Every structure is written in C-alpha cells, then in structure tokens.
Amino acid sequence: MHKYFLIPAIIFFIIISLIVIYLQFFYLDWKWDVLPDNFDVKTETYTKKNLNKSCDDNGNIKLIKLDEDIRDNRVFIDSNDVSNDPSIHAIYLLPCDAKDRNFDINNDIHFTIQSINNWFLEKTKNQIINFDYNDNFIDTTFIRVNKSINWFTKFNSIEDNKKDAATKIEDLILSNKNIFKNFENKKFIIFFEGWEKRRSITDKVCGRSRYNGKIAIFYTNEKDKKIKSCTKDNIDKSNKKLFGESEQTILHEILHTLGTPPKCGKNVNFAESLHVSDNNDDIM
C-alpha cells in the first residue's frame, strides 16, 4: 500500500478513534442533545406532550398562577422591605409546564443563600452580601409564566443571542418591575426551573449574568435523563450547610452583577473573558 494513502488513512482512523473515546468516556450526554424532547428512551417511542391549558407559547408573555401553586407561606409579590438599602432579591421562576419543587417555601433557597453568605464571611473575614429578607428568611417571590420550557430554550446556532433563555428571563423580570418593592435598588438572583440550551458540544451553562447587570440566573433543572449535570448537588439536598458546586455557581453569577472581578485587576483580561486567569480555585 502506498505510503501517501496509508498516512492519511491512519490519521483519519486516529481522529475517529479519539472522537469515539471522547463521546464514550468524557462527554456522556451527547445523545440527549440530538434526541427530540418527546423521545422516551425507556420505551423508544415518541410521546405527545400535552401542555397545561395555561401555556401559550404564541401569545403575549403573562404571569400566571395555577391552583396548585397556591401554598402556605408562598408570596407572588415582593414583601415590604425593612430598608431602602441595596439588596439582592430571590425569585423562584417556573415555566408553565415545570414541576413545582417548592424551593421557595421549603427553605432550600434560604439555606443555599445562607451557605453562600457563611462561606463569603469566612473568606472575606468581615463581609456578607445583603440579601432581601422577610421575617428572618430570604424573601423569595414565586413567579410562573405562561411559556413552556421549549419556548425558553428555542435557540440554535443560526439565531442571535437575543433568543437564549437568559435574555428572555431578564426581559421578563425587567418588564414586571411593578411586583417588586424598591426595584431600582435591587438586583435579582433567579432560580429557574429549566436550563439553557447548549451552544456547542463543550459549552454547558449552569448560570448566567451580566457584568454590573441586574439579573443573575441559576438553572435548577436539566434536560431529562442527562448523565452529567450542573445540578448534581442541587439546592434540593439534605445537607443544608453544603457549599457545593451549585452554591459556587450562584455566588459566581451574583458577583458578576456586583462588578466582580474589577476591571483594574492584574489577573483579568476583559477582552477575552470576565474571569480571573491566575488561580483555578478562585470563585471568579
């Protein structure tokens, strides 16, 4: 066999082998990115998803309230503030077809934020982040919207970034400022019962925010049956004092909205990234 044929053939075989190894052992959930949302892997059939009657992906965006959403201690409008000081307000946001896991009323959000502030106090020695409280618990507003998870994640490479879930969430909050007290002095951490659609095979989004922005987002859910997950130690956990990967993501996104890392930092290159470059253990 001629060497000019053999060398390209060997290179091609090596490339294919590396791709197979990567998909088999490192990127385990590739198959779930190409399967349609309505494909049931157990029965290997396509199922028709019946949306709640309150869902309206084609109409105007509206805040809705299902009968089952009405629970003791749940609030749908921001509670009165004890001061006008700048603070961060928590929101539990659900698409119309999302399961309510009660993160707002079973204190999972409260204990997650408490874990973040305990860690932050220890690392900074004397600082905490000022969150919005009501009766000594994190003041969390429950919001359900008349859009399905598919509406939030309807995005592909030929569309611009305005179509991603994060921008839709940001627009939703900014256009409903009337349900919040002292809106101008608040930033928001959104616990969204959904996910951000992948942009590439290597890009998995666990949280989003803008530098010096108004909104930070943590994705509390994932596409069904994925093996690898941003939420493997999600806020739905028994160890209420854990500062795990979820808490790290939440704090990371909140700090971005507060202007961290500073642009004058010697270990940042804002032309390439909003993250520090000299320490892998740095929260930023």
Task: Give the predicted meaning of each segment.
Residues M1-I14:
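N-terminal Sec-pathway targeting helices
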Residues R199-L242:
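Active-site scaffold of zinc-dependent metalloenzymes
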